[in-house]
Structure formats: C-alpha cells, structure tokens
C-alpha cells in the first residue's frame, strides 16, 4: 500500500484534513526562504493534537545547524527530521545521534546519476526522498512544483521505503507511482491554492487518489 506525506503544513484545518484523509506523515518546514516556513513553537502547537495519532511528524530543514536541531527537539519533538540540503553522510549521522529522531535525506534529481548518489546514505537514514532538481536560481530546494523523469526510480531497491516527490498532485499521483514504483509519495505545492496556502479539499483529493493506487 502506498503511503503519503503532506508537507508544508501551517494551519490546523490543513493538519486535520491530512490526518482525517489518512496521511502517514505530516511535514512542517523550517527554512526562512520558504513561504511555508514556521517557527518550532508554532509547529509544536499544531502537532500537540497528534500525539495519540499514528501519523508521523516530520521537521523539514535545509542544512540545519545544531541549534535548530536542539530547538526542534525541545519544542515540536518530531518523529523524523528531513534534510534537504548538502548534508554529508557524516553530518546526517550526527543529526540522527544528536536528535534521537529518524532522518529523511532528500536528493535533487534530474538524471540517473543523481539517484545513484543516494547509495552513500542507504541504510544510514530512515527514508530516502527523490525530488525534482529546482530550476537554476531557485532559492527553494523543494516544494516548487517541478517534476523529474519518474521512471528513473523504476526498479531501484533500497533498504528502507523511499519517497517520490516533485510536482505531484491529485491528478497525476497514480501515474507517478506506476512510473516510479515508489512506495511513498510526498506532496506540497500540489495541494495548495497559492504559495504556502494549503487547500484542505485538495489534501483530501490527493489522499483519496493515493488510496486508489
């Protein structure tokens, strides 16, 4: 069964829609250049109602320093920390040990060689994530709506289930899963009515589409 992560949540109604729709993961962004950026205290308030829920909370970061990791663990207490920058295997190991949380390592993909880079992290992290490489000059490493050739993931096997991300929405997620074979999917801009503005109806539609895969 394919599982979904709804990323970039910032309002209670969006969180509620994600959980009610059956999302396995909910993500909160901590990156100042993103329209979805939150402070850890605000995220902690949003996830307070989820402690009795099986949904896993994810703190999405870009090259986080130790101070941010410590602040996240003191406030939001995420189940997983997603790193979406230039983190090395050594740094990823440090983040995992310092936080005690699982780590999702994201990769920007435009070719098979980009997928190959994940091998150095396989077995080191809880999940790998393959996202579209942003256009040149973009300040955001993800959440841009860009896609890559989903078939680059077809036949790839990793020690833990991996995520497909980048340009997914309620209308193409079934095709994306079929083309990639990915067991996990991640969506952000594809369920928004504007930059950073999640639409609960689109969240529900996306999760319904995933259930039909």
UniProtKB/Swiss-Prot annotation:
Keywords: Amino-acid biosynthesis, Aromatic amino acid biosynthesis, Isomerase, Tryptophan biosynthesis
Keyword NAD (UniProt): no
Catalytic activity as recorded in UniProt: N-(5-phospho-beta-D-ribosyl)anthranilate = 1-(2-carboxyphenylamino)-1-deoxy-D-ribulose 5-phosphate
CDD domains: PRAI
GO biological process: L-tryptophan biosynthetic process
GO function terms (MF aspect): phosphoribosylanthranilate isomerase activity
Pfam families, alphabetized: PRAI
InterPro entries tied to this protein: Aldolase_TIM, PRAI_dom, RibuloseP-bd_barrel, TrpF_fam
Protein name listed in UniProt: N-(5'-phosphoribosyl)anthranilate isomerase
């Amino acid at each position: 069964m394919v599982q979904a992560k709804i990323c970039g949540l910032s309002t209670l109604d969006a969180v509620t829609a994600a959980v009610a729709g059956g999302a396995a993961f909910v993500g909160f962004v901590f990156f100042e250049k993103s329209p979805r950026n939150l402070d850890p205290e605000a995220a902690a308030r949003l996830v307070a109602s989820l402690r009795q829920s099986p949904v896993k909370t994810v703190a999405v970061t870009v090259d986080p320093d130790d101070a941010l990791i410590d602040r996240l663990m003191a406030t939001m207490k995420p189940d997983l920390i997603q790193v979406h920058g230039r983190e090395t295997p050594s740094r990823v190991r440090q983040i995992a040990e310092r936080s005690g949380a699982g780590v999702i390592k994201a990769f920007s993909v435009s070719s098979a060689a980009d997928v190959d880079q994940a091998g150095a992290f396989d077995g080191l992290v809880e999940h790998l994530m393959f996202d579209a490489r942003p256009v040149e000059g973009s300040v955001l490493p993800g959440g841009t709506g860009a896609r890559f050739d989903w078939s680059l993931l077809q036949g790839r096997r990793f020690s833990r289930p991996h995520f497909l991300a980048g340009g997914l929405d309620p209308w193409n997620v079934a095709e994306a899963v079929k083309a990639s074979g990915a067991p996990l999917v991640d969506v952000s801009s594809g369920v928004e009515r504007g930059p950073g503005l999640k639409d609960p109806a689109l969240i529900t539609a996306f999760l319904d589409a995933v259930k039909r895969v």
